[in-house]
């Protein structure tokens, strides 16, 4: 008897791809065969094959906000993508299809529904993306990373790496800390220019005796400029292009300043760290603000829109923080963690396949 097969559809950004890979790893451990539907020219084209997962190529991308000419091309591009998806689906014969978001998931999800192959959809953000809003109407199971995102959906959380869930509690980590606060600044793998600009200025406005110790992930293309900005502000800082061991960096931090992508918010909760979220202002549907509010509304994080994030405001905010408060916020964040999210999604996929057989 051949192993059951799942086709995972996700692409475009790490926020869609990494949760899919987490589910893939669990199902492979259970003896499942995993295939992936994605665009080989995008991020998944590197990340997925590197995990030993065979990818079925499908080139389809979002046209939202690209003007009238792009919309006129949509019928042709969508038809081509549907035909590609049908070909791959006929060859793979999956027992269940899992859509994790990104435009590449839409044609595959439509074909799965037409073939009556069980379709499971997971939406990571607090505001559903275009593809998942449509696919949710066709899916057997709809799962979300945040509450009240799609009608009738089951909120299971967002999959995160096990090393984050395995960190000791905030109370244990903060117990013996003394001296200046430890500040971690993360703008994503590419950095966040607004944070790179404001944070050095803010720390320069804080007297040296009160100034936090800072580690700042800049993004490779901004590293030299960031180092120069800290030097200009008279601030010693550990500036890095990319943090390989994020679990250790979060564990060592008293306070984090970061964007509010769905996976970032999930990782903040899983690690149990006090965070100031500065949402990406131009994200589609302002979904990062909605993501951040999941924790900030519960007093489990802070939220500051980028347009009012000034160096003086941030300097004042940092000097008002102390470890007692930060530990309490970190503990509330961890209370919102969903460490079983990947396993829960895998369980739903297995059950959907069994119901069909």
Swiss-Prot record:
Phosphoprotein keyword on record: no
UniProt topology in membrane: Peripheral membrane protein
GO annotation (BP), single: peptidoglycan biosynthetic process
Keyword field: Cell cycle, Cell division, Cell inner membrane, Cell membrane, Cell shape, Cell wall biogenesis/degradation, Glycosyltransferase, Membrane, Peptidoglycan synthesis, Transferase
Domain of life: Bacteria
Pathways involved: Cell wall biogenesis; peptidoglycan biosynthesis
EC number of this enzyme: 2.4.1.227
Reaction(s) catalysed (UniProt annotation): di-trans,octa-cis-undecaprenyl diphospho-N-acetyl-alpha-D-muramoyl-L-alanyl-D-glutamyl-meso-2,6-diaminopimeloyl-D-alanyl-D-alanine + UDP-N-acetyl-alpha-D-glucosamine = di-trans,octa-cis-undecaprenyl diphospho-[N-acetyl-alpha-D-glucosaminyl-(1->4)]-N-acetyl-alpha-D-muramoyl-L-alanyl-D-glutamyl-meso-2,6-diaminopimeloyl-D-alanyl-D-alanine + UDP + H(+)
Subcellular location: Cell inner membrane
A Pfam family of this chain: Glyco_tran_28_C
PANTHER family for this protein: GLYCOSYLTRANSFERASE, UDP-N-ACETYLGLUCOSAMINE--N-ACETYLMURAMYL-(PENTAPEPTIDE) PYROPHOSPHORYL-UNDECAPRENOL N-ACETYLGLUCOSAMINE TRANSFERASE 1
Protein's UniProt name: UDP-N-acetylglucosamine--N-acetylmuramyl-(pentapeptide) pyrophosphoryl-undecaprenol N-acetylglucosamine transferase
Gene encoding the protein: murG
């Amino acid at each position: 008897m051949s192993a059951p097969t799942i086709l995972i559809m996700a692409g475009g950004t790490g926020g869609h791809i990494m949760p899919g890979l987490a589910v893939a790893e669990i199902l492979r451990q259970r003896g499942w065969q995993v295939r992936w539907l994605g665009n080989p020219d995008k991020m998944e084209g590197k990340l997925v094959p590197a995990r030993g997962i065979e990818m079925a190529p499908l080139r389809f991308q979002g046209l939202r906000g690209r003007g009238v000419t792009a919309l006129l091309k949509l019928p042709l591009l969508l038809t081509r993508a549907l035909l590609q998806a049908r070909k791959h689906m006929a060859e793979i014969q999956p027992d269940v299809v899992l859509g994790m978001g990104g435009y590449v998931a839409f044609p595959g999800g439509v074909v799965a529904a037409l073939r009556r192959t069980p379709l499971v959809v997971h939406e990571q953000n607090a505001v559903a993306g275009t593809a998942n809003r449509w696919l949710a109407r066709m899916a057997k199971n709809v799962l979300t990373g945040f509450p009240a995102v799609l009608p009738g959906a089951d909120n299971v959380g967002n999959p995160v790496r096990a090393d984050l869930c395995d960190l000791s509690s905030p109370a244990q980590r903060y117990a013996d800390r003394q001296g200046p606060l430890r500040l971690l600044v993360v703008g994503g793998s590419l950095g966040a220019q607004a944070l790179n600009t404001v944070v050095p200025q803010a720390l320069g406005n804080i007297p040296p005796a009160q100034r936090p110790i800072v580690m700042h992930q800049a993004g490779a293309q901004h590293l030299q400029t960031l180092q120069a900005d800290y030097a200009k502000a008279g601030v010693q800082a550990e500036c890095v292009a990319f943090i390989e061991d994020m679990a250790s960096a979060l564990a060592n931090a008293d306070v984090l300043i970061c964007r509010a992508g769905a996976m970032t918010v999930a990782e903040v909760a899983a690690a149990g760290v006090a965070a100031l979220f500065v949402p990406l202002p131009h994200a589609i549907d302002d979904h990062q603000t909605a993501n951040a509010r999941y924790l900030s509304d519960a007093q489990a994080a802070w939220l500051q829109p980028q347009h009012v994030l000034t160096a003086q405001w941030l300097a004042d905010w940092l000097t008002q923080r102390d470890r007692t408060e930060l530990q309490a916020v970190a503990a509330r964040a961890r209370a919102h963690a969903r460490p079983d999210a990947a396993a829960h999604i895998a369980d739903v996929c297995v059950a959907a396949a069994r119901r069909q057989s």
